[in-house]
Every structure is written in C-alpha cells, then in structure tokens.
Amino acid sequence: MCIRDSILIVAVLLQIIFFIPSFLLKTEKYYDLVGSLTYVTTVSLAYFAVENKTMIDSIIYFYVMVWASRLGIYLFRRVRNDGKDVRFEKAKRHFFWFLQYWMGQALWVSLTACAAIIAILSPEEDTLPVLAMVGMALWLSGFAIESISDYQKRVFRKENNPSESFIHTGLWARSRHPNYFGEITLWTGIAVIALNTLTGIEYVTLISPIFVYILLTRMSGVNLLERIADERYGHLEEYQRYKRNTPVLVPKLSKDKI
C-alpha cells in the first residue's frame, strides 16, 4: 500500500474513532477539532515520509500546520463557549445522519489538502521559484484575513448578543463573510506553491481551492449562515441595508456606514 492510500485511510479512521463517542454522548464539540487533527496528521504523514525534504515541502507543511492549529482551536473554543453548533442540532441524534457529517469531513480534508500532500510527496528541486513566492503571498494574505475576521467576530460575540445584533464592523463591513474569503485565498496560495512540483495526473489536485470555494459558498458555510442571519435579523432595516451594500464574499475597498 502506498503512502497516499494510507493517508486517505487514516483520514477516514480518525473520523470513525471520534464519531462513535461523539454520537453516544450526543455532542458535536470535538467535530471541528478532529477536522484540524486530521489535517495535521495526514500532512505530517506525507511530510515525514519524505527523506530529502525541500524548502517548498517545509513551507507547505508549516503553512498547513499553522492554519489547522489556529482554526481548530478557534472553532473548539467557540462551540465550547456557545454550548452547541446549530449545524448539528438535529443530526447528532441520528446515527447515519451524524455519520454523514463525519465522513464528509474526511472527504473535506482529503480534497482540500490533496495539492499540499501530493506536492510534498512529489520530487522537485530545492528552489523557490517566483510562482511559489506568489503562492506564499496569497497564503499570508488569506491567513491574515481569516485570522483577523475570526478575532473580530469573537470580540463582537463577547460584547453583544448574537441573537439580537449582527457584526458589521472591521473586515465584516467590507464583506459579509471575510473569513471564508481568507480561507479560499490561502488554499489558492497553497495550490500555487504546489503548481511547480506537480506533473501529469497530479495536476488534478489543483481542484483543492475550487472545492473549498464550492464547499464554503454553495454546499455549506455562506448559504447556511445567510439563512440563519435572515431569520434573526431580516426584520431590521440596518441589516437589509448591510446586505444591499456589502458583498457576500470578495471584500470591497471602501466600507459604508450602517
């Protein structure tokens, strides 16, 4: 069995291992943390399987570790403080419904990290081409946007009741979902860094940022949060004005006063 197959199996096994106690306890508190753990584990398996590591290998590995660790801790703290995650309110009581989320997480990790994993496992010269530098700039920009957005939202939720008021300050005055824009941007950066190392069929892994975009804007993320926000704040004129004047995803350069 090759290392690539082993990594996919590990991603699935981790979900099963943590799904069982989570279902028995009817809790979703560890879901996002396990997602981050799966990123860390699978990318680490790829990285430490390579004998002659290059600069690009180490950069990609470092970027994924930093992103997964920060996001996992942030999401775990959020669900712990909130006491629940609205995504799983009904699903966690039904075995197969809840299991679908966990298996979906294995797919999410595998497709999102595929470019990073294949790039690490692919042999390439230990150089840092201009294309990789462009990718690094994209990753750093995306990571900064996502981190700042999450921090601003965490501070807002501490000072306000999210069931009564919505965040529309900071980066959230420029985009209704700046954190998702940041995540899409940073995974695009990883794909650009990986581009120089891929050959043949490996170019298929460039689906990574496309999958992240589709997942966050079409399958979950934006659609779910927009629906929840409409239900909570749809009666507020300032919310309707915010929706009219603020892009869903790509931040605008200027911000309007709400």
Predicted regions and their residues:
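A basic- and aromatic-enriched beta-loop-alpha substructure that forms the phosphate/nucleotide-
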Residues: 56-92
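Select subsegments of transmembrane alpha-helices in polytopic membrane proteins
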Residues: 31-33, 96-109, 176-183
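Juxtamembrane helix-capping/reentrant segments at transmembrane boundaries
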Residues: 25-41, 83-101, 165-172
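C-terminal ends of transmembrane helices
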Residues: 16-27, 73-80
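Short, small-residue-biased leader/transition segments that mark boundaries at the very start
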Residues: 1-3
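Hydrophobic transmembrane alpha-helices
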Residues: 5-15, 38-69, 109-152, 158-258
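Transmembrane helix irregularities
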Residues: 24-25, 69, 103, 175
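Short, hydrophobic transmembrane alpha-helix segments
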Residues: 19-29, 46-53
